Amino acid sequence: MMNTYFQQVNRYLTMVAQQESEQINRVAQLIVKRLVQGGIIQLFGSGHSMLLAQECYFRAGGLVPVKPIHIESLMLHQGARQSSQNEKKQAFLAPYKDELQFDDKDVCIIISTSANNPVPIDMAIYAKEAGAHTISLQSLAYQQQPSRHPSGQRLEDIADDVLNTHVPLGDGVLTVDEFQYGPVSTVLGAALLNALCAQIIEILHEQGASLPVFASSNLGNTNNDELIDQYGQRDSFLRP
């Protein structure tokens, strides 16, 4: 089954590359316009989706102006069941609204495979209210799953743009008897996000703009201090 899993991952990655490349490029162009104006990319997810919000952060070869939004009661290390339950609670995010730091030049990528829970939907609403451009990273395979938000809207109804991961219902790409296993949401989401960042860097290069890209701290005398100082005012975790 191991080889079958790799084959399935390759099949889905090929599907994403073939069907989403135009949208990835369009979204990358939009993000570049905001980055050159001084905006940053903020990413949010709960549970395993938070892993994807952290994937692009402080990453060698990745963009510096990237900031994950941490709400610990929605993260796995504070309790896996709790994070899942909290994501489904109406108005759970409201007490955190004033802590969010969106600028009208920012982009907010909200990550939710199912895209029907109140917390990611509220995050998109709050980001839009602050003037940020909102992008959902989700699987449209779940589009028929009803919203749990009191408005009845799903994440794709709120977000300005959608990036479709094509993750199948139930996440797993393998089955044995009645059991579905072999999840791909993290693999596909990480690949799509890194492809987006790569396209952003390519566009910045084509425009002759400076490239805010982290060099690896494990390869000789690299120094990212200047870039960290530049963006540290927007991200306290980058400060000494």
From Swiss-Prot:
Xref: Gene3D superfamilies: Glucose-6-phosphate isomerase like protein, domain 1
Superkingdom of this protein's organism? Bacteria
Q: Which GO terms describe its biological process?
A: carbohydrate derivative metabolic process
InterPro entries cross-referenced by the UniProt entry: RpiR-like_SIS (IPR035472), SIS_dom (IPR001347), SIS_dom_sf (IPR046348), SIS_GmhA/DiaA_subfam (IPR050099), UPF0309 (IPR022951)
Domain SIS, chain residue ranges per copy: 31-206
Any S-S bridges, and between which cysteines? Answer: none
Molecular-function GO term, any one: carbohydrate derivative binding
NCBIfam families according to UniProt: PRK02947.1 (NF002805)
Which family would the database say this protein is a member of?
Belongs to the UPF0309 family.
Q: Which HAMAP family match?
A: UPF0309
Q: What is this protein called?
A: UPF0309 protein in nagA 3'region
**Originating species:** Lysinibacillus sphaericus (Bacillus sphaericus)
